[in-house]
Structure formats: structure tokens, C-alpha cells
From Swiss-Prot:
It is found in: Cytoplasm. Keywords: Cytoplasm, Fatty acid biosynthesis, Fatty acid metabolism, Isomerase, Lipid biosynthesis, Lipid metabolism, Lyase. It catalyses: a (3R)-hydroxyacyl-[ACP] = a (2E)-enoyl-[ACP] + H2O; (3R)-hydroxydecanoyl-[ACP] = (2E)-decenoyl-[ACP] + H2O; (2E)-decenoyl-[ACP] = (3Z)-decenoyl-[ACP]. It comes from Pseudomonas putida (strain ATCC 47054 / DSM 6125 / CFBP 8728 / NCIMB 11950 / KT2440). One of its GO terms (cellular component) is cytoplasm. This is 3-hydroxydecanoyl-[acyl-carrier-protein] dehydratase.
Length: 171
């Protein structure tokens, strides 16, 4: 069977309901916290490190929930949502690889913000470069990522870490 290498909004919503990778396995958050509209490319090869890559997009419009509250009179997408989107995508990669368990963000190295997403923007693009996938007692991916708005890079994150756990009782 050939793996799917692109995912629509409906595919991602199925993932948020636990229908894409099976019950108890990697899920994306439901809207409003789902920060991705589509994955345009996912591969277990390629990227900066030759270990895999993802490219995903979020359509921006002035009616998105966060613009109304962050900040009143100065609307901007919270940077932490872009960071969370990158964690979401690293977790998705683990589920797509067939690794069992529920995803949890485990941290990151250096994160830099040097731009912003405003209501007049059209599209955010996420680029994830898988550095390493650990398989065993702990299934985890480590990746670097970036966020661009309308083609201009505005955030970077190094060492994004996400694990999948078959039990989160002692997490």
C-alpha cells in the first residue's frame, strides 16, 4: 500500500476525531486549535536532514478567532499558535509513520519570532524538517521548523520534540 503524501482539511478533521490513524493513536486538535488547513507534502525522505519533511498551510482571514482577542485594536496571531502548529505537524508525522500512541509536545530548543501574522495576510506556510525519529520504548521525533506568511519567513524553531505514548497515565 502506498502512503498518502498530501492531506486535505477533511483528512485533518478526521485525524482530529481519531479516525485517520486509529483509536488511541496520534490526533490533531479540533478546531479552533487546529492550526493547519492542509498538508501539501509529507515524506519520510528529504528535508534538510534527509529524514523527512512536511509542508502545510493555514488560510488566514480577518474572522479567525484569535484576531478578536489578541490584541484588541492591534490584532495579531499569537506566536505560540505557530509554534503549536509545528508541534502538531511533528506529531502528525509520527502517526503517519504508523507509530502507536497519543502525541505530546515535549519541548523545543531555540525559538525565534521576527515577524507577525496580521488579519490582512493570506496564507501561513509551515516547513518541518525531521532530524531524527526514535523508535523503541519511547517513540519520538525531533525536527526543525519554520513559519512563513505570504512567502516571508517569520518564525523558526530548532529541536521541536514530540513523542507518542500508548499510556499517558503517568505523564
Amino acid at each position: 500500500m502506498t502512503k498518502q503524501h498530501a492531506f486535505t482539511r477533511e483528512d485533518l478533521l478526521r485525524c482530529s476525531r481519531g479516525e485517520l490513524f486509529g483509536p488511541g493513536n496520534a490526533q490533531l486538535p479540533a478546531p479552533n486549535m487546529l492550526m493547519v488547513d492542509r498538508i501539501t507534502h509529507i515524506s519520510e525522505e528529504g528535508g534538510k536532514y534527509g529524514k523527512g519533511e512536511l509542508v502545510a498551510e493555514l488560510d488566514i482571514n480577518p474572522d479567525l478567532w484569535f484576531f478578536a482577542c489578541h490584541f484588541e485594536g492591534d490584532p495579531v496571531m499569537p506566536g505560540c499558535l505557530g509554534l503549536d502548529a509545528m508541534w502538531q505537524l511533528v506529531g502528525f508525522f509520527l502517526g503517519w509513520q504508523g507509530l502507536p500512541g497519543r502525541g505530546r509536545a515535549l519541548g523545543s530548543g531555540e525559538v525565534k519570532f521576527f515577524g507577525q501574522v496580521l488579519p490582512e495576510a493570506k496564507k501561513v506556510t509551515y516547513n518541518i524538517h525531521i532530524k531524527r525519529v526514535l523508535k523503541g520504548k519511547l517513540n519520538m521525533a525531533i525536527a526543525d521548523g519554520s513559519v512563513s506568511v505570504d512567502g516571508r519567513e517569520i518564525y523558526t524553531a530548532e529541536g521541536l520534540r514530540v513523542g507518542v505514548f500508548t499510556s499517558t497515565d503517568n505523564f
